[in-house]
């Protein structure tokens, strides 16, 4: 491609509304342009990278045995009502009506559509397992779209759905897809981690997320320093402290703590560390058969934070997790929130593992402006149910027994789920088994954020000059910069000859033949992030050389003109060959 005939829409200034580096560089490099909040047009340069990501995803999915389909983006409400998600999904589901007043939605995901398709197409166990995928535009009406294509409302996603006769078959495909995702992210040149995850609104029994490690990541991911354990912060297990709980050493004492309503304030007032206290959080209980919901107390160590996903998934807790209001607390306990404690508490109590290991601790006295010191489980407060309620912290023991936990920031670019029969049962998707009996199919689903990968790669691969693309997804693998080619026929001819030679060898090449100053050309090529750059100049040609510089290199080097291709093949062995 000749730059003189190509849209090079680079910008010198960083847009004021671009918060993270990938958003800034995608705008400055001329990859995308904003249409409205969370909506972006992909310009030719950005689209080249996007298509390369799609190609790698498609190739690996095809290798796995999955079959490509393309489903409608607009979906009828009846399918979502059948699965029960029409009301459950919330505000992210963009609902609309056609001219006849019928309800539709713009699909954020396609479980319902694929289940409807397969229940009408597959009839026998002999047709299973089957895995179908698409690469398609999705829409989620994000409350606060931000970070460019990282958290856009409209985005491109690869979503796949597998169907099975039994859980064992699902397990096998799940393993295949896990490896397929690793193959994809390896080929994309990303530093990533697969981690155990919560299934969220999609549902299902088991799931893994794939995170690109980046300081700008919105998610916290946890992994062992010495083992294979890895999970996101929502799923990471906080193991119980080792050893027995210490024996009581203090007597229970009530202390006046006027105006002290937070853990930090009480700790400072009493002169003791927060880890020697507990905090009591009251949440709504699961409704009984009459539809009435009481309260449940969650007890954590004072320096720990509640993991809301863990709590919400516990039996007896209302979903979604709902904190009790001040009025509800005062009515049930008789005090304000800052003074609650587990001693003689008139509601069911669930104690976190770490809090259950404390002795001689501090807690609220269940009356305003008073706390208790020297509190001990069994003697002063009942402890009938212990659960993992908290977020892990760096340095915690790893659940696999190998080393301690490290916490990093990550960008989620993939997620795989074992759905089980959540959708197939609700929508009666079944086949006849080997005995001729009707059997509800087991399902899996597997998503990759294709457009998000582009931004995530930039978060990992950039410097002060711009993007540094991995060869596999660079919009162009090679740039040829001609210096004063519009004035020098020798330079123009040499540039054209090298351009054709590299193109015929299978490389994606950008020939920068623009009538621009050398500094402008170099700055644009570095901003765009093209991995390999050759400079053609009269001075170099007189010596029989070209100047070469890799995007990650500090130094330039002179290469004999007739060795340019062989040099490039060594520098980029995959290239386009």
From Swiss-Prot:
It is an enzyme of class 6 (ligase). The keyword Nucleotidyltransferase does not apply. The keyword ATP-binding applies. It catalyses: tRNA(Pro) + L-proline + ATP = L-prolyl-tRNA(Pro) + AMP + diphosphate. Its main location: cytoplasm. Coiled coil: none annotated. Catalyzes the attachment of proline to tRNA(Pro) in a two-step reaction: proline is first activated by ATP to form Pro-AMP and then transferred to the acceptor end of tRNA(Pro). As ProRS can inadvertently accommodate and process non-cognate amino acids such as alanine and cysteine, to avoid such errors it has two additional distinct editing activities against alanine. One activity is designated as 'pretransfer' editing and involves the tRNA(Pro)-independent hydrolysis of activated Ala-AMP. This is Proline--tRNA ligase. It comes from Marinobacter nauticus (strain ATCC 700491 / DSM 11845 / VT8).
């Amino acid at each position: 491609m000749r730059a003189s005939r190509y849209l090079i829409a680079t910008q010198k200034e960083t847009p004021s509304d671009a918060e993270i580096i990938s958003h800034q560089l995608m705008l400055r490099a001329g990859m995308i342009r904003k249409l409205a909040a969370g909506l972006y047009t992909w310009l030719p340069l950005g689209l080249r990278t996007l298509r390369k990501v799609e190609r790698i995803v498609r190739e690996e999915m095809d290798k796995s045995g999955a079959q490509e389909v393309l489903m409608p983006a607009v979906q009828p409400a009846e399918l979502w009502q059948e699965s029960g998600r029409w009301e459950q999904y919330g505000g992210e589901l963009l609902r609309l009506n056609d001219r006849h007043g019928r309800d539709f939605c713009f699909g954020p995901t396609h479980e319902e559509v694929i289940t409807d398709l397969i229940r009408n197409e597959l009839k026998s166990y002999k047709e299973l397992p089957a895995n179908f995928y698409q690469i398609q535009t999705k829409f989620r009406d994000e409350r606060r779209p931000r970070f460019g294509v990282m958290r856009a409302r409209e985005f491109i996603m690869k979503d796949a759905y597998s169907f099975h006769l039994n859980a064992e078959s699902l397990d096998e495909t799940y393993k295949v897809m896990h490896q397929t995702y690793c193959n994809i992210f390896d080929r994309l040149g990303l530093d990533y981690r697969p981690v155990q995850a919560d299934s969220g609104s999609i549902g299902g029994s088991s799931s893994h997320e794939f995170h690109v490690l980046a300081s700008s990541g919105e998610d916290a991911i946890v992994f062992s320093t010495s083992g294979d354990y890895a999970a996101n912060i929502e799923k990471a297990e906080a193991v119980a402290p080792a050893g027995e709980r210490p024996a009581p050493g203090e007597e229970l004492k009530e202390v006046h703590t006027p105006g002290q309503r937070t853990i930090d304030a009480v700790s400072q007032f009493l002169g003791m560390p927060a880890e020697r206290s507990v905090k009591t959080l009251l949440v709504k209980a699961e409704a009984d058969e009459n539809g009435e919901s009481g309260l449940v107390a969650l007890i954590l160590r004072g320096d720990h934070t509640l993991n809301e996903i863990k709590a919400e998934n516990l039996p007896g807790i209302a979903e979604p997790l709902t904190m009790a209001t001040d009025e509800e607390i005062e009515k049930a306990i008789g005090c304000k929130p800052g003074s609650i404690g587990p001693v003689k508490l008139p509601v069911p109590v669930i104690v976190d593992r770490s809090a259950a290991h404390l002795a001689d601790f501090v807690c609220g006295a269940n009356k305003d402006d008073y706390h208790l010191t020297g509190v001990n489980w069994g003697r002063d407060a009942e402890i009938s149910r212990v659960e993992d309620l908290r977020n892990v912290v760096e340095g915690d023991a790893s659940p696999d027994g190998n080393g301690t936990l490290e916490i990093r920031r990550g960008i989620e670019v993939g997620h795989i789920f074992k759905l089980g029969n959540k959708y197939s049962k609700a929508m009666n998707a079944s086949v006849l088994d080997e005995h001729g009996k009707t059997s509800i199919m087991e399902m899996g689903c597997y998503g990759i954020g294709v457009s998000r990968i582009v931004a995530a790669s930039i978060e990992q691969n950039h410097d002060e000059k711009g993007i540094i693309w991995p060869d596999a997804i660079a919009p162009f693998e090679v740039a040829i910069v001609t210096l004063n080619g519009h004035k020098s026929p020798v330079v123009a001819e040499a540039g054209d000859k090298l351009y054709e030679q590299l193109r015929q060898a299978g490389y994606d090449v950008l020939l920068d033949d623009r009538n621009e100053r050398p500094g402008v050309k170099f700055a644009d090529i570095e901003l765009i992030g093209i991995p390999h750059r050759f400079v053609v100049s009269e001075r170099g040609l007189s010596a029989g050389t070209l100047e070469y510089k890799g995007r990650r290199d500090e130094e330039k080097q002179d290469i004999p003109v007739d060795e340019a291709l062989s040099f490039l093949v060594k520098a980029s062995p995959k290239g386009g060959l």
